[in-house]
Amino acid sequence: MKLLNSLILLVLTCLVSSINTQFISIQKYDFSGNCKNSSDSASSFEASSESAAICMQNDLLSGIVTNEGVCLIFNEVPTTFIISTKGDYIVRSIYDINDNNCQGGIIENKAIEIDECFVECADDYHGSTYLFSTETSLNYPSNTFMEISYNGECDGQWKTSFNYLQYYIVNKCNVAHEIETHTFSVGCNSTSSWVSEYAGEVCTVEPTVTTSYPIVDNCGDLDNSNFIDYCNI
């Protein structure tokens, strides 16, 4: 009887743990919006009045899926994300640009509404379109190149000790405006990934340069985290 009770308790504990586990999904879409006349356009989140129109799945460019509180680089600065106690918004905590472990103290907190498209403005005419959401299971799209951080045994079984992953939709034209305009597309196969860079803000011409990288499978880098690349095609 004691054994049966122990097994029931173990199952219930696993179920509660599974139910309480939430991942934060950050999806970046092709820019669509108006940043003109935004105050503090270099750093503020500007809500779009066309929230239902700008986050179309066909316009998805890249994304991040992360556990709460994990230190990662987001828009060029060290950042952590947590879900509010009531689960109605996500708190983005920004750290000093040189604080790659997010341990030197928070510079700024920003509250981000869940499941609402918004534009983070770079200037009057450029910005990035995002959609933040929460997930109870680990989800990511196909036709992507993925960079994954995980802890524990360095055996490639990253789903059991997952920190975060960043993905890029392959062969999609990305125009980044976080610090300066940078236009690129990403491709991959089982042995390598490559980044093609373009002049201007379109990818319809020949790339100015294409750089290839071997698929990464590193152990114990950056505060004992393991990193692995995955071509999810």
Swiss-Prot record:
Keyword set includes Signal: yes
Glycosylation sites: 37, 189
Transmembrane segments: none
Alphabetically ordered keywords of this record: Glycoprotein, Secreted, Signal
InterPro entries found in the cross-reference section: CfaA/B/C
A cellular component annotation (GO) from this entry: extracellular region
The UniProt record lists the keyword Signal: yes
One Pfam family linked to the record: CfaA_B_C
Subcellular location: Secreted
Primary location group: secreted
Name used for this protein in its record: Counting factor-associated protein A
Organism of provenance: Dictyostelium discoideum (Social amoeba)
